[in-house]
């Protein structure tokens, strides 16, 4: 399959200038090093992802080739991981092959592709692109008054590596239909979905309402529920499977306000094809992003309220309040209050301050404080310097009461548009992180992660990045998708190109 796909696209190259357009991009990542306390410490591995596309009028063909090589036996692979043929004409779009599609707000099924992200599971030690697609077909029609989408495909279990058989990574067969009408900026829609795997077959429906009052407010609401003979279609008891999501947003010039609500119960479908909105703020700061609340789809409800205001002198204020409730054998409450303020003292300074307070009963962290500052200073010409400081204080009550301190310091210099260099230092006295598994003793005190990061854009199509040192892992969230990043000690080189 790989050879046939590459031969097909190579055959199109001579015709591309006359009959169409050929484009692509490539990501190459080399690592020399390993996880902490893991042998060998000088492990050598590399990962490569090549994406090629050909477009002629309404026809588009794409493929993705991935390979990974490591000294660890059994983790290497070389695969044609994606291919797609897409046809688009007027308001009709058809796809065959691998595709990323979402029905509604993702309460029932969501596909995604986190561009530039490389995923690795500790159990397999194999790196590959982080995406969840389907293999099958999709048809979509988007009219002025009516829209329609139908899909059928096998969903990818992206926690399993490409070194396994394809059948083992695509267990769920998803069949879905979404349709709706739009009148006077208001949309009413319906979703029907069936998910089948060797263990079960589930049926769901979903009602959609969305729209806006132009220039004033916009809203989005979805209610999803399973279809079963012994369960009423609107039941919300312990035996039911349902999800509810709603959002309101208001924007008026320099002021904006948004509100989100969620209520998910027994909404883990199949191997995890559903991925509803998290309704928690996705932080850009390291200590907060690692502490982000990850929704538990077996039972979770909550709200998020966020507002912003931009002053006449371009100062910017952001406020966010989040609350989530998990009802298991007892209630677990998550609360978070976040404030961020950006201002410009003088022509060359840009300063951002933030403060955060949270309680997380599921993690037994109460309270949890964080604060920090980012200072950008324009030196001369296109040169600037950056100082980034974060601090987090946590009280944790498990067997014993303990206090943790997490810190981040980043000192960097950059030249616009393509050069940046930074010294990164992180520290923590969290006992979950500091104990060395290769010794009989229980280590305490502080653990440190020093590192160097650099990036250079050689030209508009080629970028080279470098990391050397120790990198702290942990939870990370991007575009509403949360995953685990592994620790790393060594050297990492990335080269990205597009053509």
At which residue positions do the language-model features occur?
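Exposed, low-structure sequence patches enriched in small/polar residues
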Residues: 29-31, 38-47, 64, 78, ...
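Outer membrane beta-barrel
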Residues: 59-152, 247-271
